[in-house]
Amino acid sequence: GVKGVLACMQLADGKLLWIKSYSKDFGAKWFGGNAPGSSGTAASRHGNNGPPVTDDKYIYAPAGGHEGASLVCLEKRTGKLVWKSGNDYAAYAGLMIGELAGVKQVVMVTAANMKGYRAKDGRELWSVPVKTGAARNIVTPILHGDTVTVASHTVGTFQIRIRNSGTGQVAEEIWRNKNVKTNITTPVLIKGHLYGLGTSRGRNSDFVCLNHQTGEVVWSQKGYDDYASVIGMGNTLLVHG
């Protein structure tokens, strides 16, 4: 939640089964104003908003503890800590779990970076910078094959490919489109194309279609808000904005 509380409740009656505090248990700081590393003129942060994700017996949560608990893995039924890793402050982006270059991992976009953590033990596998003037990122990364695509209102939209190197992994940039600066809406991937909002111009954005392999704009359409939601249903797009 906004104040950094992760809770598990029984669905039938709402009984609280376990609860964790990001600040007390993992050393996270709550931000109600400008986040560390921001320009000081950006919109205020509103606490811890990145959603957790479950996988098998575990739940992964972007706790944002900058002293070894940026990302935490807990037992889903008990809330017991399995591992913690990383030193970055949290962002608003959702976590993604997938296999990249043969390694199952959790991809996390933090306040200043995008990182891959090995799912079984939290080992950091790779990292690329996603620095913004506001020290916050919102768009959830898109995993496809061994590639990860992400966007920011400062750096634009870019894609990396993960490959194994020695005992670890490296991230290689495939393309970057600096003109498509998606701020809030996560694009959807359908049949080799990314669909989402482009650069915001004060509550007025273009809806754009990008080639997933090259990052080139295929087409664009004006007249959308900065906060439109996009849902892909087969060959149909539902766009609210």
Where are the regions that the model predicts?
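Noncatalytic, solvent-exposed loop/strand surfaces
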Residues: 1-241
